[in-house]
C-alpha cells in the first residue's frame, strides 16, 4: 500500500511540475516576435508593426495559460479589464524597460481581485498586428486559476 501511495504521489508531483513548465513557456513563445517599421498616416511617423512568427500564430484563438502580474488600469481592486505583465509592476513594459511583447490586455469573465503576487490566468489568446492603440496581445474570456 505504501508503494502504491508513493507511486501515486510521484506521478502527481511530476505532472504538476511539467504543467507548470508549460504554463511558463507561454511568455517565452510570445517573446519570439519581431517588428518592422512602417509609416503611419494618422500618427505622421514610422511605428513598429509586430510580425508574428508561425509559433505565435499557432496560439492565436487558442486557450493558453499564462503566469504573470496584474497591472491595474483603474483604481479598483476587482477588475474585468486590466493589463497583465510577465514582470512585476516596477519591471513591466510601462515602468521598467521591458518590451511590448511582455504585456497583454485581459478581458475576464468575472472581476479578478488585484494582488501584487504572480497569478495564473487562462483564456483565449488574440493577436493584434494593426491597431496601434491596443497592445499586441489580448487574453479574452480570462479566468484566474
Regions found by a protein language model. Name each.
Residues 19-145:
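OB-fold and OB-like single-stranded nucleic-acid-recognition modules
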Residues 4-13:
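Sec-dependent N-terminal signal peptides
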Residues 14-18:
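Sec/Tat signal peptide C-region and signal peptidase I cleavage site
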Amino acid at each position: 500500500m505504501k508503494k502504491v501511495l508513493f507511486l501515486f504521489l510521484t506521478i502527481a508531483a511530476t505532472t504538476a511540475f511539467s504543467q507548470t513548465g508549460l504554463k511558463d513557456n507561454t511568455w517565452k513563445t510570445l517573446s519570439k516576435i519581431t517588428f518592422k517599421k512602417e509609416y503611419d498616416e494618422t500618427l505622421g511617423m514610422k511605428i513598429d508593426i509586430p510580425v508574428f512568427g508561425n509559433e505565435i500564430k499557432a496560439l492565436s484563438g487558442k486557450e493558453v495559460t499564462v503566469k504573470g502580474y496584474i497591472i491595474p488600469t483603474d483604481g479598483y481592486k476587482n477588475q474585468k479589464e486590466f493589463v497583465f505583465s510577465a514582470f512585476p509592476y516596477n519591471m513591466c513594459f510601462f515602468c521598467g524597460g521591458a518590451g511590448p511583447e511582455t504585456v497583454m490586455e485581459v478581458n475576464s469573465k468575472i472581476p479578478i481581485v488585484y494582488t501584487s503576487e504572480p497569478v495564473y490566468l487562462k483564456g483565449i489568446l488574440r493577436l493584434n498586428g494593426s491597431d496601434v492603440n491596443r497592445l499586441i496581445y489580448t487574453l479574452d474570456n480570462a479566468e484566474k486559476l
